[in-house]
Amino acid sequence: MSIKQYSQEQLKQMALVEIAHEIFSEHKKPVPFQELLNEMISLLGVTKEELGDRIAQFYTDLNIDGRFIALSDQTWGLRSWYPYDQLDEETQPTVKAKKKKAKKVVEEDLDLDEFEEVDEDDIDLDEIEEDIDLEADSFDDEDIDEEDDDELEIEDEMIEEDEEDYDDEEEDRKD
C-alpha cells in the first residue's frame, strides 16, 4: 500500500518508524534525515514544533529498528537495499586527509661516540648492593623522630593558643 493511500487519521495513528518505512519503500533510495522529517510533517499535516516532542524517540527507533541503516552524512535507507558485502563500502564515511603546514624540525645529531659502551660482564652487582646497604645504614631514624617531636610541640602550642582565644571569647560574652 502506498503512503498516499492512507488517510490523514490512519497516518496520525501510525508510528513514525512505520511512516518512515513507507516513505523509503516509495522513494526506493536513501533520504537525508531532515528531508525525511519534512516529508513526514507534510504527510501528517503538523508543524515541526508539534512533532518536536517525538523526534528524539523517532531517531532512537530508527537506530534500533533493524530495517533501517544509517549511511554517511545523516542519510538513512532500508537495510534490505544493501547486500552485506556492500554495507562496509556505503556506510563508512570517506576520510578527508587534513593538510598540515610543514613544520621545520631541527634535529640535533647525537654523537654516539660520546657515550661509553658498557659490557654487562664488567658491572659488579655486589659492589652496587654494598653501596646501597651503606646508604641505608647511614640513615638515622632519630632525625625523623626529632622532626616529629618538633611538629607535635608546634601543634600543642597552636591548640593552647586556640583554647586561650576561646576562653577569652567566652568571658567577653558573659560580660
From Swiss-Prot:
GO molecular function: DNA-directed RNA polymerase activity
UniProt function note: Participates in both the initiation and recycling phases of transcription. In the presence of the delta subunit, RNAP displays an increased specificity of transcription, a decreased affinity for nucleic acids, and an increased efficiency of RNA synthesis because of enhanced recycling.
Alphabetized UniProt keyword annotations: DNA-directed RNA polymerase, Nucleotidyltransferase, Transcription, Transferase
Family the UniProt entry places it in: Belongs to the RpoE family.
Domain HTH HARE-type: 14-81
GO terms of biological process kind: DNA-templated transcription; regulation of DNA-templated transcription
InterPro entries named in the record: Asxl_HARE-HTH (IPR007759), RNAP_delta_N_dom_sf (IPR038087), RpoE (IPR029757)
NCBIfam families in the cross-refs: RNAP_delt_lowGC
Name of the protein: Probable DNA-directed RNA polymerase subunit delta
Subunit structure: RNAP is composed of a core of 2 alpha, a beta and a beta' subunits. The core is associated with a delta subunit and one of several sigma factors.
Region Disordered, residue ranges: 110-175
GO cellular component: DNA-directed RNA polymerase complex
